[in-house]
Amino acid sequence: MSGSLTLLKEKHIRYIESLDTKKHNFEYWLTEHLRLNGIYWGLTALCVLDSPETFVKEEVISFVLSCWDDKYGAFAPFPRHDAHLLTTLSAVQILATYDALDVLGKDRKVRLISFIRGNQLEDGSFQGDRFGEVDTRFVYTALSALSILGELTSEVVDPAVDFVLKCYNFDGGFGLCPNAESHAAQAFTCLGALAIANKLDMLSDDQLEEIGWWLCERQLPEGGLNGRPSKLPDVCYSWWVLSSLAIIGRLDWINYEKLTEFILKCQDEKKGGISDRPENEVDVFHTVFGVAGLSLMGYDNLVPIDPIYCMPKSVTSKFKKYPYK
């Protein structure tokens, strides 16, 4: 990348806008299973860039509703695919961003809540769908979706919190499940789940200190962050690590200047978008987490983003906080 480093806002907006015009590309159809997630990533990036109107609200809402899986009572990534917790959260986030949760209607909302709660297991963990994959991503996904819907209960929250705490490791990180390797994305899902449950006080001061050190040690000499020791830096960890540090009040433990430079070097200055590392191909996933990371660092008057929900603070400020009064 040549010249002085700056965020190419307009190019990123045009890049995101162009993604749905590439239906002639084979890659477009290979990513069907990520379509609803991709719309959430794109919309959130546009919100951070202060350009949510780039997407046509009515068209997005219509597509979200077309992904409803009536057999299981939740949202799939694409019409006629199977429902999953991850895509259900994306659907709820999109509708909440547009202040359109009421389009669900009473019956669909009841079924949606039942689907989410029904994926919780006896140990407090959640499976993503009926096929049974279990890890801390789905605990966060379930609690986040229920929180946005205002439907958290102690029967769901308390065992979920117990499971998350069992995933804390001796090195200050969190794993996919108890005794699994620490990973930055799991730090976010676990800390995010505890924050949504209003249970961060279940972590001792010493544990919070250890978590902070493990997270800030993810920064490498070139400025980028990795997900675990001995791995390459990746722009997406600008979100997973920074949001986790923000949740525990240690955001300034990262060198902002170096991380900002790393993210900006990952931009495609011709077509827009952000990649995982400099000179690699861009995608909407790394674009949203790149601009979200910059927002957390207060860069260039970007729209403030909530580190717990990865949604604009102007949206999350309306959510009911658990425990409900």
Curated annotation (Swiss-Prot):
GO molecular function per UniProt: Rab geranylgeranyltransferase activity; small GTPase binding; zinc ion binding
Binding-site list for Zn(2+): D234, C236, H286
Self-association and partners: Heterodimer of an alpha and a beta subunit.
Residue ranges of the TM segments: none
Binding site for geranylgeranyl diphosphate: 183-185, 228-240
Additional notes on this entry: Present with 1520 molecules/cell in log phase SD medium.
Keywords carried by this UniProt record: Metal-binding, Prenyltransferase, Repeat, Transferase, Zinc
Protein's recorded name: Geranylgeranyl transferase type-2 subunit beta
Family that this chain belongs to: Belongs to the protein prenyltransferase subunit beta family.
EC number: 2.5.1.60
The organism's taxonomic lineage, starting at the top: Eukaryota, Fungi, Dikarya, Ascomycota, Saccharomycotina
Cofactor(s) this protein cannot do without: Zn(2+)
Coiled coil feature spans: none
InterPro entries: PGGT1B-like (IPR045089), Prenyltrans (IPR001330), Ptb1 (IPR026873), Terpenoid_cyclase/PrenylTrfase (IPR008930)
PFTB repeat ranges per the UniProt record: 9-50, 57-99, 109-150, 157-198, 208-249, 256-298
Keyword Repeat included in the entry's annotation: yes
Source organism superkingdom: Eukaryota
Organism listed in the record: Saccharomyces cerevisiae (strain ATCC 204508 / S288c)
UniProt entry tagged with the keyword Repeat: yes
SUPFAM superfamilies in the record: Terpenoid cyclases/Protein prenyltransferases
A cellular component annotation (GO) from this entry: Rab-protein geranylgeranyltransferase complex
Annotated catalysed reactions: geranylgeranyl diphosphate + L-cysteinyl-[protein] = S-geranylgeranyl-L-cysteinyl-[protein] + diphosphate
GO BP annotations listed: endoplasmic reticulum to Golgi vesicle-mediated transport; protein targeting to membrane
Role according to the record: Catalyzes the transfer of a geranyl-geranyl moiety from geranyl-geranyl pyrophosphate to proteins having the C-terminal -XCC or -XCXC, where both cysteines may become modified. Acts on YPT1 and SEC4.
Note on how the cofactor is bound: Binds 1 zinc ion per subunit.
